[in-house]
């Protein structure tokens, strides 16, 4: 017999009963961590409690800024897995709807999102990272050693400048202590407060509801980062199958919504590519106590 989740029993079901629904019902296509329980609720899986805290804190904070976000009604713990039971937003994901939209509709939605982004950016911080712990989970800041929690402008600039000027491992290991002490050609010199950033405004994470309003989902990576990270994050997806006009519309859409940071985007993509291929590239600089030596790992792990 097919299981049917009873919305009225959301708070009376035991964790085990809800897990039975989660394990029995089909997940969303291409989103194995998300299981629709009913037309009203869905369950999203998380691997750690820290991930749950990051996501829930970000959604609560965004809601306090006046942004419509999915409400988390319950957190289910089963063995070592965690599930947030939250609102299922009605509508069509923007990556599906995008191909049917014209220029005028795209512009209208771009200005909608612009208002959301401005509201997010009204919240500022002198340190980077997620709300609960200040953990820098940005995919532009995740080499092997990562940054310390609540990283400062100095830490973030040093990290980005190190990878922007990374000469390759053979040359890096030959640097002198004096060469490790300063960045020869700094590209990044961010000196303003970090702003609250969704950090994954790809079209798959925006729902066009029946009233024509954009609803933002998937706040897992949200935190305080440089302004350019929001714009860059809007290009962090594959446009496979998109026509040239669809890509042009998205470029205009992201510029209106997030501001124009094409130079920063190109550098961030270069930086990400470099530390993806040379994840331990900062080790020599760290051993020398260089300008980019800040990490959240203990010293003994760096010296091993």
What are these regions (language model features)?
Residues 200, 204-206:
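Catalytic-loop signature of eukaryotic-like protein kinases
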Residues 146, 168, 175, 238-304:
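Helical subdomain adjoining the active site within ATP-dependent kinase catalytic cores
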Residues 23-146:
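ATP-binding pocket architecture of kinase catalytic cores
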Residues 191, 195-196, 209-264:
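Active-site Asp-x-Gly
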Residues 106, 119-199:
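An alpha-helical support segment within catalytic cores of ATP-dependent transferases
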């Amino acid at each position: 017999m097919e299981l049917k989740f009873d919305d009225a029993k959301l708070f009376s079901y035991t964790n085990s009963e809800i897990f039975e629904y989660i394990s029995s019902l089909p997940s969303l296509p291409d989103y194995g961590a998300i299981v629709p329980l009913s037309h009203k609720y869905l369950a999203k899986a998380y691997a750690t409690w820290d991930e749950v805290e990051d996501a829930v804190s970000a959604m609560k904070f965004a809601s306090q800024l006046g942004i419509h976000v999915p409400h988390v009604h319950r957190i289910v713990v089963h063995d070592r897995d965690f599930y947030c039971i939250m609102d299922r937003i009605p509508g069509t994901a923007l990556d599906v709807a995008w191909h049917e939209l014209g220029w005028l509709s795209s512009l209208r939605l771009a200005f909608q999102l612009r208002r959301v982004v401005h509201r997010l950016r009204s919240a500022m911080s002198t340190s980077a990272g997620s709300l609960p712990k200040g953990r820098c989970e940005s995919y532009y800041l995740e080499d092997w050693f990562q940054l310390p929690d609540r990283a400062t402008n100095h830490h973030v600039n040093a990290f980005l400048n190190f990878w922007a000027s990374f000469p390759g491992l053979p040359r890096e290991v030959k640097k002198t202590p004096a060469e490790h002490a300063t960045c020869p050609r700094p590209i990044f010199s961010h000196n303003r407060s970090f702003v609250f950033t969704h950090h994954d405004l790809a079209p798959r994470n925006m729902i066009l509801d029946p009233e024509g309003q954009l609803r933002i989902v998937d706040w897992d990576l949200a935190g305080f980062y440089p302004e350019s990270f929001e714009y860059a994050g809007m290009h962090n997806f594959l446009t496979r199958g998109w026509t040239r006009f669809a890509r042009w519309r998205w470029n205009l859409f992201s510029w209106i919504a997030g501001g124009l940071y094409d130079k920063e985007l190109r550098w961030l993509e270069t930086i990400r590519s470099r530390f993806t291929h040379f994840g331990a590239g900062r080790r020599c600089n760290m051993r020398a106590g260089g300008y980019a030596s800040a990490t959240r790992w203990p010293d003994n792990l760096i010296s091993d």
